[in-house]
Amino acid sequence: TYDIDRPATTLSQLETRHKLRITRPASDTVLEHFTFNRKVDAGKVWANHNDAVGERRFTAEQAQEFALQATRSYVDVHCNVFSDSEFSDMIETLGAAGHISLRVDRMVPTRAPFNEFHVALRKP
């Protein structure tokens, strides 16, 4: 996925977004999305090819402009970034803290040559 270089979403980021009742991607999220966005060939990543990850798709100036746009209107980006294990851990942590009443029911982990995982959540 083009988020390959983006840092994983943290618990504090999720809690802050919840407390602020953010309903659309915030400018910092938009900035990260466009700053770290790269062309990625998932099959080549799994095969450890040197050319699997391309150059960044946007300049710093373009990323800043999208972030500024996000202060005025909706900009479509991935708001949260997790690997399969990070997501599972986050759901467990949020549940243990009493923030959510969901548990992972089933998970299909990321498998070669793909770049996604699938999860079904369940209320206890």
Predicted regions and their residues:
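S-adenosyl-L-methionine-dependent methyltransferase catalytic module, highlighting the catalytic core
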Residues: 1-122
